[in-house]
């Protein structure tokens, strides 16, 4: 008998399991809109979060991979007089130095391409500061004509392996043949000088030639750099190097080089962007998902009671509904990861946004270690929320579970007790009562609108801040047509002859030590106003002759303010010069600015190395005095590319925020429509037309949207401020949000909310008044 009962129980259990599977499919179909919207919410939240975290991690991974494969130097010793073979051996004798090489990079004009320049590098040891071969012959240090050219420059200018090329530097012609196409860590961000933001391989590239070709053309070995591979800390290495060479030399750690610092800046920027805005996407999606899951189980209360009455054990009912939450969160997470990788690939590929900035041989997508554990935690959390929601509905007997869900009684609002309340239109009163009764739904709608507003205003704010910075610093700050670079061998008379001939302002740049920090000291004579400097309030000022001007980063790092005194030490000597801080300015690099008269007053030695003139580049002839000429147009063209990349990133954020906002509000609106179905049917019975009911719904969403915008805009400004602080190590920008940004944010957010309201209001036409009013009886 017991065996028959056991067999019958097994049979019933099998049928029960099959019934639950069918019910799950019916539930998915019945609530398909809610389930699809929840999946999309999780997908968007995780997709945006993973995308921007993959971006910075991939930059970091591929950057270090190139640095390792091209033997990127840890330190660079610089001496304008050059280093001998004996100097190199003295550095190699330092304990902890792995390898070293004499090195030089020169900017030369390409004779076959008028106006083009190429940074030519020569290393005496290929195991230090070399390159990665993409195509062609291996490097040969004894080659008399070998040129290993940037593959990007070759592609943009249709240059092939085997083609002849010639360059001119300081009136010296270097001839050779392209033996290979390469990428190099030293030129990962290939720009002609520090004023250019974005690479332009159409007009500027890089190449390596052999020491044999270089020394044979020049006639003697001149190497102003020794590049070093070492794990010694910067302070110790500096002391040991000075001791080995017998004097103080300029030593630049890799962290201060252009390629390394700019790439690190991109990583830091990516971390900041990936930890603030995408986190908001994730938070909005999760909060709304939790609310929706709870309300779905409330809607299923009678179904839960029916299953309980049929004899299904609580554990099976719990497993059934918890499985729904698990499937939704898992499917949304899988799709989110796929979306994240897809968006990251759009950004991180040779033809993508970052491909125009970084010159990398490998574009592997890498995710930070914490992304997948976090996604697992999210799936577990959402599943657990589903479990708690259904567990709450199972309390009590089957008959109690079968009874319809009754919202808790809400106390009358204070305003309801006043005479004013009776004067308020019926629709407004109805909306106020509904908002108070359904606080959670209202709160989630507010979260969606606030989040959308924060992301939108922050994105537009970044765009406007960057545009203003570039406009003030470059468009209006650089008032010259061409920048002339003078030869190191030119005499003072020859330099002043060029200044007079082209009626230009002039400057000199040298590296100095401020405490243990290497910074640029820029000395200017700007009588013609060819360069304008801006203070920390983004206002132009003239450089005076009785003090120094320091950038904001130096001011903050060394706690220096106007009137303070500080000391600098030029490399190659033991002198110290005391300076008074005359002002603080915004800059794209860590530098100090003084006038030529103040430099002469302090007896600071310098050589004029650049002239700023209104004469066009094509009208300036190269000579043994003028080594190269750059036009302002080259710099401004690079900004267009930079702004295009930045704008695409920000548009992606705004589009994602609007899509997420629409999904969140539509999901909550649909659930709200289901909850208020009977109330709206009652309104139809007493004579309200569909248009009038729709207007009531519009007004409620409009009220919530306005409140969300009012709260979201200040929070968005705080978010933008936080992001700018995290980017302060790379840019010294003043936050700028104009009226257009506010208007666009308000219009987009309201349009999104009203669009969703319209979609929900259209459902009023399908209300069955008889069925709705007798449903709970």
Predicted regions and their residues:
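Juxtamembrane segments of multi-pass membrane proteins
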Residues: 76-77, 426-557, 561-564, 568-570, ...
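C-terminal transmembrane helical bundles of large multi-pass transporters
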Residues: 608-611, 622-744, 750, 756-759, ...
